[in-house]
Swiss-Prot record:
Guanidinium ion exporter. Couples guanidinium export to the proton motive force, exchanging one guanidinium ion for two protons. This is Guanidinium exporter. GO terms for biological process: monoatomic ion transport. Pfam families: Multi_Drug_Res. It is found in: Cell inner membrane. It comes from Proteus vulgaris. Belongs to the drug/metabolite transporter (DMT) superfamily. Small multidrug resistance (SMR) (TC 2.A.7.1) family. Gdx/SugE subfamily. The keyword Transport applies. The lineage of its organism: Bacteria, Pseudomonadati, Pseudomonadota, Gammaproteobacteria, Enterobacterales. It is a multi-pass membrane protein. GO terms for molecular function: transmembrane transporter activity. One of its GO terms (cellular component) is plasma membrane. Residues 1-3, 51-54, 104 are cytoplasmic. InterPro entries: Small_drug/metabolite_transptr (IPR000390), Small_multidrug_res (IPR045324).
Length: 104
């Protein structure tokens, strides 16, 4: 169950990371509320997942999911660069996440 909670926490990290762009420095109310709520719930779920997982593993996977998801969102929605170096770097993060899961 800890792994599922950690995965959902990582997805919520994507929500708040992308949401930061839409808050315009927290000057827009609705995106700011959504972003702050996602931050709180994501970190709460991360904390809960750490009850059953090593802290270093949980944190690394949480940030990895957030980083890869946010980068992919940026490529698809914001038209950010998708060059080979960026894609290979994202793939290495994914393989690192898989490795941490297999090692736990």
């Amino acid at each position: 169950m800890s792994w599922i909670i950690l995965f959902v926490a990582g997805l919520l990290e994507i929500v708040w990371a992308v949401g930061l762009k839409y808050t315009h420095g927290f000057t827009r109310l609705t995106p700011s509320i959504i972003t702050i709520s996602a931050m709180i719930v994501s970190m709460g779920m991360l904390s809960y997942a750490m009850k059953g997982l090593p802290a270093g593993t949980a944190y690394a996977i949480w940030t990895g999911i957030g980083a890869v998801g946010t980068a992919i969102f940026g490529i698809i929605v914001f038209g950010e660069s998708a060059n080979i170096y960026r894609l290979l770097s994202l793939a290495m993060i994914v393989f690192g996440i898989i490795g941490l899961k297999l090692a736990s």
